[in-house]
């Protein structure tokens, strides 16, 4: 139902044409699951300004892709805040860290959530609330855990991982 993944942008490849980015994404990004490729670019990564993309698909609908790349660790942290707000108030929104894209989530009912992304082409989707939020939490956890494991001397995402654990507990209590 949901596919969520994180890609890290290769700093040695300049993105000049968004129209070819999707078809050539492997030239510009490394999949977080590909540890050997990640390790091969470790020396050129700027861990204070880590660019990448979060890929989110619901069935066949693309909600986020490589064309919305940004500071990926910050974006994941922002998404965790949105999830926390949705669980607390039914609504959460954020702007991307380094570009003027607004992302929002609103509870439509106990079991539905409206996901909106004000990108060049506006994305709107009503998604199963529980499954979507859980998939996002798991996607964030995978990203932060994998980064901590792979780049132990360069990053420390323990605060984000603690927040994920807190969200899991709140999630299980609220939904």
PLM region descriptions:
Residues 49-95:
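Aromatic- and glycine-enriched beta-alpha-beta binding-site module
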Residues 1-56:
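N-terminal "first-domain core" detector
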Residues 122-175:
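Mixed-charge, glycine-accented linear interaction segment located at domain edges/termini
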Residues 78, 85, 89-132:
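An exposed acidic His-Trp-rich patch
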Residues 43, 90-96, 100-101, 148-162:
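A short, charged
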Residues 9-28, 72-86, 152-159:
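Charged, low-complexity, helix/coiled-coil-prone segments
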Residues 37-48, 82-84, 102-107:
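Short linear motifs in intrinsically disordered
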């Amino acid at each position: 139902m949901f596919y969520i993944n994180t890609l890290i942008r290769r700093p040695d490849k300049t993105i000049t044409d968004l129209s070819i980015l999707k078809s050539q994404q492997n030239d510009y990004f490394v999949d977080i699951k590909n540890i050997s490729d990640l390790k091969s670019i470790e020396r050129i990564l700027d861990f204070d300004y880590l660019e990448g993309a979060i890929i989110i698909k619901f069935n066949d609908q693309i909600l986020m892709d490589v064309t919305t790349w940004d500071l990926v660790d910050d974006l994941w942290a922002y998404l965790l805040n949105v999830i926390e707000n949705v669980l607390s108030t039914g609504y959460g929104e954020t702007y991307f860290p380094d570009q003027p894209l607004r992302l929002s989530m609103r509870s439509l009912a106990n079991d539905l959530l409206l996901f909106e992304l004000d990108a060049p082409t506006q994305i709107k989707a009503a998604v199963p609330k529980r499954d979507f939020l859980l998939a996002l939490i798991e996607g964030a956890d995978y990203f932060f855990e994998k980064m901590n494991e792979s780049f132990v001397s360069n990053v420390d995402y323990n605060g984000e991982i603690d927040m994920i654990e807190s969200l899991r507990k709140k999630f299980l209590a609220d939904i």
